[in-house]
Amino acid sequence: MFRKKMLVLALFSIYFLSIEAVRNESFPALLAFGDSMVDTGNNNYLLTLMKGNYWPYGWNFDSKIPTGRFGNGRVFSDVVGIILKSSLQCFFVISAEGLGIKRIVPAYRKLYIAPSDLKTGVSFASGGAGVDPVTSKLLRVLSPADQVKDFKGYKRKLKGVVGRSKAKKIVANSVILVSEGNNDIGITYAIHDAGMRLMTPKVYTSKLVGWNKKFIKDLYDHGARKFAVMGVIPLGCLPMSRLIFGGFFVWCNFLANTISEDYNKKLKSGIKSWRGASDFRGARFVYVDMYNSLMDVINNHRKYGFTHEKNGCCCMLTAIVPCSNPDKYVFYDFAHPSEKAYKTIAKKLVEDIKTGLA
């Protein structure tokens, strides 16, 4: 009787492990492109003022050491990587971390990238980057073209580790997480001298979607196939925007949010049209709704355990001394969500990604 039970258990184990093996093949890696929402430290290796490798950034990160991430801990790409990998582990396993779940997504420009990280994902993103050609030049960060160039270098390294055939398969099945538009709207268009004088918001947002499509097409031409394209966050509700334009009640900036919504609407519509298009044959796309997800947290912050939705925890005139508990703040600094805010919105968004790209 005991032998029968053990045999049945062994068969079930083999069955479920085989299912998990197939599922793990679905998304072998996470490759992140774009801006500071998904930059894990590439700007550390650039001559730019756009850096997050100093105190108080990284306060809640491992060993409390700043890594170049713009926040108190993990950024959105890290959190997505954790959830994707966790959800793909066999449910028999108690200690997921002991199995080597990807707890962080390393920056591609790090001086050393372990072969295991090449196989499971890196970030090519650069804080301050944008698809408008002016944005990255203005802030001296990695442009979309620079990130595509790094992507090509990554592919060469990956081939050296796993071989040409497997490298091609990994790239084609990886989640390609793209975050663009935030700096284009929030800095280049809204603040840069020429921005609003040259074109209307509606014309500019249409151009942004076109530039984003070109960036994604460049990635597609180099083997990427599964794209999770992030919309912009509610830029009018950033602590910086509230402080400058919010008046006595520190309200959200209506115009900035209207432009953000218009861009997101056009991006979402564009993504629908790209599916099945001849120039994107075999590609899959999913829209990642950052705007409404974060706005829900802002509007219902107490429900999610936050007490501060208007001000950042640090790095502002209203927070020269960092707060004692970043988990109580939706935003860590003047423009970037806290790690807890990312974690709060990520679970639902990752489910959308898995469903849309499966």
From Swiss-Prot:
One Gene Ontology biological process? lipid catabolic process
Please give the SUPFAM superfamilies that the UniProt record associates with this protein.
SGNH hydrolase
Where in or outside the cell it occurs: the entry states: Secreted
Q: Where is the active site?
A: S36 (nucleophile), D333, H336
Write out the tissue specificity statement of the associated record: Flower buds.
This protein's source sits in the domain of life called: Eukaryota
Q: Hey, what's the signal peptide range on this chain?
A: 1-21
Carbohydrate attachment residues: N24
- What GO molecular functions are on record for this protein? lipase activity
Write the record's keywords in alphabetical order, separated by commas.
Glycoprotein, Hydrolase, Lipid degradation, Lipid metabolism, Secreted, Signal
- Enzyme Commission no: 3.1.1.-
Cellular component per GO?
extracellular region
Which InterPro entries does the record cross-reference, listed alphabetically? Answer: GDSL, GDSL_lipolytic_enzyme, Lipase_GDSL_AS, SGNH_hydro_sf, SGNH_plant_lipase-like
Family that this chain belongs to? Belongs to the 'GDSL' lipolytic enzyme family.
User: What is the designated name of this protein?
Assistant: GDSL esterase/lipase EXL5
**Organism of origin:** Arabidopsis thaliana (Mouse-ear cress)
Q: What high-level taxonomic lineage is stated for the organism?
A: Eukaryota, Viridiplantae, Streptophyta, Embryophyta, Tracheophyta
